[in-house]
Swiss-Prot record:
The modification Phosphoserine is found at S61. Its main location: secreted. Disulfide bonds join C44-C71, C46-C87. It comes from the Eukaryota. Heparin binds at K96, K97, I98, I99, K100, K101, L102. This is Platelet factor 4. O-linked glycan consists of Gal-GalNAc disaccharide which is modified with sialic acid residues (microheterogeneity). Keywords: Chemotaxis, Cytokine, Disulfide bond, Glycoprotein, Heparin-binding, Phosphoprotein, Secreted, Signal. GO terms for biological process: adenylate cyclase-activating G protein-coupled receptor signaling pathway; antimicrobial humoral immune response mediated by antimicrobial peptide; cellular response to lipopolysaccharide; cytokine-mediated signaling pathway; defense response to protozoan; immune response; inflammatory response; leukocyte chemotaxis. Belongs to the intercrine alpha (chemokine CxC) family. Chemokine released during platelet aggregation that plays a role in different biological processes including hematopoiesis, cell proliferation, differentiation, and activation. Acts via different functional receptors including CCR1, CXCR3A or CXCR3B. Upon interaction with CXCR3A receptor, induces activated T-lymphocytes migration mediated via downstream Ras/extracellular signal-regulated kinase (ERK) signaling. Neutralizes the anticoagulant effect of heparin by binding more strongly to heparin than to the chondroitin-4-sulfate chains of the carrier molecule.
Length: 105
């Protein structure tokens, strides 16, 4: 039996394919927007940001890193209930308001 014949018999269900297609953008967005681990060097923590809206119920904490010698722009990092961290795009109007309020306090 050839390998092609074996793989023809292993067809995933349409529901499974649809689920994979629906989850793929979310996984890519979260992994691409993850803050880099800090190793003490003077650089921005957030290399890539996410502009997608995240429901406030999913966020456990927000951290604002002010602009300074390490990075020219303020950074907004959300920690989600599942423990993952996402760098949020500070140009999104909602996130601009959050940064302004946090920097004023």
């Amino acid at each position: 039996m050839s390998a092609a014949a074996v793989f023809r018999g292993l067809r995933p269900s349409p529901e499974l394919l649809l689920l994979g297609l629906l989850l793929l953008p979310a996984v890519v967005a979260v992994t691409r927007a993850s803050p880099e681990e800090s190793d003490g060097d003077l650089s921005c923590v957030c290399v890539k940001t996410s502009s997608s809206r995240i429901h406030l119920k999913r966020i456990t904490s927000l951290e604002v890193i002010k602009a300074g010698p390490h990075c020219a722009v303020p950074q907004l990092i959300a920690t989600l209930k599942n423990g993952s961290k996402i760098c949020l795009d500070r140009q999104v109007p909602l996130y601009k308001k959050i940064i302004k309020k946090l920097l004023e306090s």
